[in-house]
């Protein structure tokens, strides 16, 4: 499986834990540029990845207001589509915010699924849309928990800014949520760029306590981990992909 826009590899990690062999493509985080990358055709069974989503998120309006249009991240979904077309895999999976346009790749039928991290055993309320493309239009049947936490943690923010209450049914008021260890916390948390905040983000994303990003500043660590797919969400999707491919 080829991973595009891998970042620190959280989606890759989830797929690897479900038995896939993942090869990481270039990422600006490590000095690579997707725009100059051309994957070989016919070498990969699948392609996964989540192009930067800021342009389609609610954060975009804030960035425009404060910094101007030129500071809003570019739409790189077309680069993802180009790489899929060049690689010609059996299947592809794109992770994005719900508001982003779906990938349109000639020769593939795309099925979409909205998934919230807490629905599949995760700790957070993060909601993402997964677009699964195959030649024959296979569905993506993601297993969801019958019962899950009614007050999940707010999604980890790449900005390291204020954690806002985005739990299901949230109306903007502060709520009590719980840490992964069961302790209560307020729905509003100031995201100071501290090592403690990073450790909380590591836990919220479903990573082991020992997880670290040596060589990065704390602010860079928080940004990188906030851009990643929570492990529970990634594993649920990876399992669904595997089962879809194995279904005759």
Predicted segments with their positions:
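Class I S-adenosyl-L-methionine
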Residues: 12, 16, 36-46, 53-194, ...
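A generic secondary-structure signal
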Residues: 14, 82-86, 240
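Adenosine-cofactor binding site in Rossmann-like domains, unifying the SAM/SAH pocket
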Residues: 16-40, 114, 206, 212
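Conserved acidic E/D residue at the C-terminus of a beta-strand in Rossmann-like folds
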Residues: 5, 24-29, 95-96
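C-terminal target-recognition/interaction regions appended to catalytic cores
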Residues: 148-248
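Glycine-rich SAM-binding Motif I of class I
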Residues: 8-9, 13, 232
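Class I SAM-dependent methyltransferase "Motif I" SAM/SAH-binding loop
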Residues: 3-8, 225
